[in-house]
Amino acid sequence: MKETNTQPLLSVRDLSVAFHQGGATSVAVDHVSFDLMPGEVVALVGESGSGKSVTANSILKLLPYPAASHPSGKILFDGKDMLTLPERALRAVRGNDITMIFQEPMTSLNPLHTIERQIGEILELHQAITGAEARQRTLELLLQVGIREPEKRLKAYPHELSGGQRQRVMIAMALANRPKLLIADEPTTALDVTVQAQILELLGDLKTQHGMSMLFITHDLGIVRKFADRVCVMTKGKIVETGTVEQVFTDPQHAYTRHLLAAEPKGEPPHSDASKPVVMQGDDIKVWFPIKAGLMRRVIDHVKAVDGIDITLRAGQTVGVVGESGSGKTTLGLALSRLIASKGRISFIGQSIDSYSYEMMKPLRNRLQVVFQDPYGSLSPRMSVGEIIAEGLKVHERSLSADERDTRVATALEEVGLDPATRWRYPHEFSGGQRQRIAIARAMVLKPRFVMLDEPTSALDMSVQAQVVDLLRDLQAKHELAYLFISHDLRVVKALANDLIVMRHGKVVESGPAAEIFANPQQDYTKALLAAAFNIEAVETKAVSQ
């Protein structure tokens, strides 16, 4: 909690941030002020585009200067103004006294280096730890953030880890130097609910042990309620309300704060008709990845990412797939979509596709779409939003004129709640939540029959989550879409899924109608998942910890 009679560790005073492009200037942060005391957790909350991440990035001067500028303000850390600090002095602070966890792990991890090397570089640079000592410290950090069998992950590359595992590696890197201030920008966005709770507990323990302060940027008010000492509510670049968590949650003063507290996905999934045709079916699906060792790189074992799964999706039906990160849920979706090799039988709208090559799948791709977990990693930074969304139309609907394509793109953007005029802009100009909506628009513009939704709402604030759930329901009802909905957010799954598959270590733990499983889970593991999801507390049960 906040200490009294002491100076703030961080003091942001009258901070403004402006972006300049093509002669136009937009203000992203407008005269923001707040303090952060030693050992305190301050949450900066607001919807995507509110300016909270821009504020956080300003502290370490990570904005795209000179396109970005600060018309006003100071950022004092340990009495030093970060905005005027020389670059050499700033580098000494970055990654040492102040570390940062970003929202999208793939933007922070080097795809060419192993996990051991990336964590080891930090230990060598800041603590002069090398060799066996660095390896041991790396193993300790990976264990701390909940990565099972860390010895097997040391030589892994980022693309070989699940989204949640990548996020945990990034947290381990940030904690390696025991910083005074940790800036956490949606640090648990990609994590399943049980590990989310464990990571929050871990961060809380580290805060207590080392007197570490935290600036916690999030859209998840449930986390704020459990974890923060004070909260600052942002919208349109301004802080509109600040106070203790208890004050803001029990007696919100500003209309926008009341709007945030009231917004979350609600409602029931559309009715599923068992007489509707089967769109996608998988029987005994297996995806095994070989583990190689020795000079000859012989196969000594397998990671059984998916191990004998049966699944059926009908037109107008949503099957939710839930489980901890690394459980195999995304791998199952990729196998059904024929984006990775698998064993077992797969049929799509009556066609057996399990033996189809890449070329044979091409004519079906427009009807079989994917929305990925990490929007930044799936959107080309060199293409405008309009070009990104129109790309599939150029391949699959070549008869369309340029004007017809443009109309389809504009309609798709409107459907996901974005201004069609934004189609001339580029992905880096959007917030994380806006980028996710662009990814959804890109999939929907092709009018698919089957859509794999891999954490489609994970980067979205609560009110936009609710809008996207409503949008997905409307699109499903209109076009009889079959959704494979992969998520760790069981609140969203509850609002959207007709049927549920609970996965763990590549196998089905429990499956059936979603309403029945939510009301009366049969397996200990499912009970632990539900307890963590709806209470945001670390669940200490063998079902989760083993």
Curated annotation (Swiss-Prot):
Q: What is its EC number?
A: 7.4.2.-
Q: Which InterPro entries match?
A: AAA+_ATPase, ABC_transp_ATP-bind, ABC_transporter-like_ATP-bd, ABC_transporter-like_CS, Oligopep_ABC_C, P-loop_NTPase
Which GO molecular function, any one, fits this protein according to its record? ATP hydrolysis activity
Q: How does it assemble?
A: The complex is composed of one ATP-binding protein (YejF), two transmembrane proteins (YejB and YejE) and a solute-binding protein (YepA or YejA).
Known function? Part of the ABC transporter complex YejBEF-YepA involved in the uptake of muropeptides, the breakdown products of cell wall peptidoglycan. The import of muropeptides into the cell enables peptidoglycan recycling, which is vital for cell wall integrity in this bacterium. Is also probably part of the ABC transporter complex YejABEF, which is likely involved in broad-spectrum peptide import. Responsible for energy coupling to the transport system.
PANTHER family, per database record: D,D-DIPEPTIDE TRANSPORT ATP-BINDING PROTEIN DDPF-RELATED, TRANSPORT ATP-BINDING PROTEIN
Protein name according to UniProt: Peptidoglycan transport ATP-binding protein YejF
Gene encoding this polypeptide? yejF
